[in-house]
Amino acid sequence: LNLKGLFKKVASLLT
């Protein structure tokens, strides 16, 4: 599980 990808995914959902 890559935190970088996960963070970007969450950020994309929040934006």
Curated annotation (Swiss-Prot):
Keyword Nuclease (UniProt): no
Compartment(s) where it occurs, according to its Swiss-Prot or TrEMBL record: Secreted; Target cell membrane
GO CC terms, sorted: extracellular region; membrane; other organism cell membrane
Keywords carried by this UniProt record: Antibiotic, Antimicrobial, Cytolysis, Fungicide, G-protein coupled receptor impairing toxin, Immunity, Innate immunity, Mast cell degranulation, Membrane, Secreted, Target cell membrane, Target membrane, Toxin, Transmembrane
Primary site of residence: secreted
Keyword hit for Membrane: yes
GO molecular function per UniProt: toxin activity
Organ and tissue specificity: Expressed by the venom gland.
Domain of life where this protein originates: Eukaryota
Function according to Swiss-Prot or TrEMBL: Linear cationic alpha-helical peptide with antimicrobial activities against both Gram-positive and Gram-negative strains and against the yeast C.albicans. Shows moderate mast cell degranulation and leishmanicidal activities. Has a very low hemolytic activity. Induces an ion channel-like incorporation in artificial lipid bilayers, forming pores with relativeley high conductances. Its mast cell degranulation activity may be related to the activation of G-protein coupled receptors in mast cells as well as interaction with other proteins located in cell endosomal membranes in the mast cells.
Protein's name according to its UniProt entry: Eumenitin-F
Annotated organism of origin: Eumenes fraterculus
